[in-house]
Structure formats: structure tokens, C-alpha cells
Amino acid sequence: VEVATSVPVEATATVQVAAEPEATEVVAGDSGLDAAEPVATVAVIATEAPVATVVPVATKAAVVAVEPIDLFDKSRFADIEGIVDPTNFGWPRSVETSEGVITIDAPPTKIHALSLGHIEILAGLVDFDRLTAVYSFFADPEQSNVAELSADHKMIGFDPEEVVALEPEVIVASRFTNADTVALMKDVGIPVARTNLENSALGNVPNILLIGYMVGAEAEAIALSDEIEARMQFISDVLASSEKPRVLSVSKWTSAFAAGSGSTEGGIIEQAGGINAAADSGIEGHQQVSIESIAAINPDVIIVPQPLDGAEVFIAELKSSVVLAEIPAVKNGEIYYVAPRLH
């Protein structure tokens, strides 16, 4: 900033003139008095020196070139299946799933998830208000990890027409979503991305990154993925030298079903350092089992991942079964209820 001052070169005195009569003389014989001419007297009165006036003069601000800073590591998306152009982080952008290629013009503010697993992922990536609606079981604290958020959110039924009425900008579906439902959404022009929900936490990392890219939440997707990987590494380090118990995940509705290979429950058992006893016995997916089948599997631990009311009845049945009395899980009291939201 340059400063210009406005100051007079010299300070000048103020001059006041006062009339002051001189002494007069009386002359004898005069018939009157002759008054002398007044003489001007000069009086100098000091004045204060003027104060400098500061006048700011605008100058141009220096222009500094700033390189754009990436808010996230773009290379994390390079090998993610489904991203059509992994170098494009602008809009529009395209992704390809089993339902084909969809193009999203801008960060979607109205997203609809048809599965609980997907809405739980989205809740970790975007503001919940960007999700158009939830279903009743999303608000069940026994089944859902977003129950509190869902309780105060718009709730709809299972009629696909209700979803269409929401006018979502994109719909996220799982591989289990009814094909007719997906077809209806696509027929009215709503983009649908069908992404897989894997059976393991680490297996879901690519899915999380794909969804994050799709909705413009790349940094959040990386942060969530990093947290999952760090937690799984911690568990792996802790369990490195531990013995691996044979764990059976079994639940009962009208019949009992064991979770074998390829199941979510089985994946959790293995990541927690156990052996999936059902898979170890040749069971794939979820298969019906009898009390005798459970005895043959001979697990060290039994977990029952279903709503508490039904779980308590089934656990009592397992504990009281004569057929199961000698298997390690029953004999050692290693039968546990697991809230459905945890798998």
C-alpha cells in the first residue's frame, strides 16, 4: 500500500490587526483636541501545525498460481470393476453393472436403495437426506445398523409404484432384487445399478468404492474402505496364533438352516478366526439341516443369528436335545444368540 501525504510546505502565522491610538497632546489656545491617526499593531498568533492526512492508494494484489489439490487418491478407482472411465471424475459419469451401462449427469440428491445392505453402505457415504425412503425393517434395531436414522425418515411399502413415485435419480439394487421390480424401474427411465453385496467385509471394499464413485462420494468411500481394512488387519494380527474353533451358524424358522460356504455368516466366522463348520462338512449356501445333521457336524460353537424371540426358543431346543447332548457346543455351553444386524 502506498501512502500519499498532503502537507503545506510552510506553516504560516495568522495576522490580526488591532487599532491602537497613540498618546495625544493638548496645545494651549487650541479650541479642540487634535486626535492622532491610529497606528496598526501587528500581533502574531501561533497556529497548530497541520496534521498529515493519510490517503490510502489501492495497489493490485499479487496473483499466486495455486495447483489444484486432489481431495482423494484417484488411483484407488483405477481397477474397480464397473467404472466405465476411471480417469473421469467430473460429470456426467457412467458405470456398468449387470443391468447395463447407466450415465449419471450430476451428483444424485435422490438415491433409492432396495436392500438394507446397500442403504447401510450409503449411510456411511452420503447424508441420509439424500436417500429417498426406507422400508419398515430398516428401522428395526435388531436387524438394521441404520435403525435410528430410518426411524425418522420417509417410509414406504413394497409396491414398486411407490418407488417410482419418489422419482429417484438412481436406484441401487442387489443381485437378489426381484427382476420384475428392476424391469419396472428401468421401463420408466430410472437408472438402476445392480451391485453385489459380498459375504466378507474386505470383499465389499470394491463395491463400496464403486458406489462412492457413482454418487460422487469418492473421499468418503476411500475413508470407509480404509477403516474396514484397518479393522480386519487388527483382527488378523490378534488371531494369528489362535486356535480355530469349528463354528456352526444355524437359524430356525419353520425348519433349521445352516450357513455353509458362500454365505455371509460363514464369511464372518472365517474372518473372525473360526472354521465354518457347515462349509467344512460340505454345505454350500444355506441348506436345511436336522438335529441329526447338526450332531454330525459336531461344532465347537453354535451361533443363532435371528430375531431374539425365535432364537431363544431354538436355543432352548438345542440345549435340551438328547441327540446333541455330547457335541462340544452343547456340552460346554457354547451356544450364542447373534443379532441379525451383525451379519
Region spans (language model):
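Bacterial Sec-exported substrate-binding components of ABC uptake systems
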Residues: 1-119, 219-249
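Proline-aspartate-enriched helix->loop->beta-strand connector
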Residues: 155, 159-176, 190, 290-307
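Short secondary-structure boundary segments
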Residues: 115, 175, 251, 305-309, ...
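A short, structured surface patch at a secondary-structure boundary
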Residues: 110-175, 277
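Extracytoplasmic substrate-binding proteins
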Residues: 84, 94, 101, 180-257, ...
